[in-house]
């Protein structure tokens, strides 16, 4: 259908953008220079702990939250830098590490040490757990919606693999 073709084209474009952008070294210096508050948080999903990176906008009113789903490289400096861009636009932006608990030592993306083959295997294993992804996202949405700075509105978006998960989660 036309809708499916458009969706596929959109995902391909986001993947291309994410791949090109992830090769850039702008993200880490951006976070080092930002005046916005950011931190890692742990969100519980039952007994499972999901690590997430959150950046808050510098606004005086309650803000809408953006759950930003990473690409197929995991929660990288690039994904963390994108949370700063979301906050700059006025959103409380949280990026969950959906590889939480999938790393060789039980950690998330950082546990893979930049080994792309290992990350790919982690994503292959994660792909077998769509219910886990959904419940992790439910927990992240519930967490961010209840923050005192949030107005209760939450939107979800993502890049490449994360874009696909966004469509699935909707």
Task: Name each region found by the language model.
Residues 81, 168-169:
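Active-site signature of alpha/beta-hydrolase-fold catalytic machinery across serine-
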Residues 10-18:
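Bacterial N-terminal signal peptides
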Residues 148-159:
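Alpha/beta-hydrolase fold nucleophile elbow
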Residues 158-162, 166:
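Gly/Ala-rich beta-loop-alpha elbow adjacent to hydrolase catalytic centers
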Residues 2-10:
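Bacterial N-terminal signal peptides that target proteins for export
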Residues 31, 40-149:
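Serine-hydrolase catalytic machinery in alpha/beta-hydrolase-like enzymes
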Residues 86, 169-170:
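Aromatic pocket-lining residues of Rossmann-like dinucleotide-binding sites
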Residues 17-43, 50-53, 161:
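An N-terminal hydrophobic leader/cap segment in hydrolases
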């Amino acid at each position: 259908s036309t809708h499916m073709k458009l969706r596929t084209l959109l995902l391909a474009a986001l993947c291309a953008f994410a791949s090109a952008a992830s090769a850039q070294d702008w993200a880490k210096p951006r976070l080092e220079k930002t005046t916005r508050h950011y931190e890692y948080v742990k969100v519980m999903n039952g007994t499972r702990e999901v690590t997430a990176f959150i950046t808050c906008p510098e606004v005086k009113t309650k803000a809408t939250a953006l759950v930003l789903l990473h690409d197929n490289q995991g929660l990288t400096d690039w994904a963390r830098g994108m949370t700063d861009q979301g906050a700059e636009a006025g959103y409380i932006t949280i990026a969950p590490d959906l590889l939480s608990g999938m790393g060789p030592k039980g950690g998330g993306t950082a546990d893979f040490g930049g080994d792309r083959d290992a990350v790919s295997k982690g994503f292959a294993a994660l792909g077998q757990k769509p219910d886990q992804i959904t419940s992790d996202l439910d927990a992240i949405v519930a967490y961010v919606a209840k923050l005192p700075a949030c107005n209760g509105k939450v939107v979800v978006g993502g890049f490449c693999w994360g874009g696909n998960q966004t469509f699935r989660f909707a």
